[in-house]
């Protein structure tokens, strides 16, 4: 199984989170981690994990553009999406808002089968290493679901 983790970042937190994902995946499967502007092909990816930080109430344009331009390659693929934002600090209401507004903006551009979504709490200055456990748990669940559904 080959997993491709694709991301963009502004200040580095989404890249760090993508690296945590890569570390978790490489224990169980082959993994490639790529910046959204450096993706060559998705042909050999069994699972595509795509993530974006949230700025000014939306995912980065580069990630949205990637999803729109890669429609044909994503058709028939299993896809998981994640966003990195501060909505989680607002409890259930913040999470519900983020699912609809941020995750929804990504999902509606994915022609493949969505097998998972995540809202990961970002940070302003110092990395929040407690989120590494959240990431590891999500990846473990994704891979388990992928094995069951394959």
Predicted feature locations:
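N-terminal beta1-alpha1 ligand-phosphate binding loop
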Residues: 2-26
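FMN-binding flavodoxin-like domain, especially the glycine-rich phosphate-binding loop
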Residues: 16, 23-32, 44-47, 52-150
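N-terminal short beta-loop-beta anion/metal-coordinating cradle
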Residues: 33-37
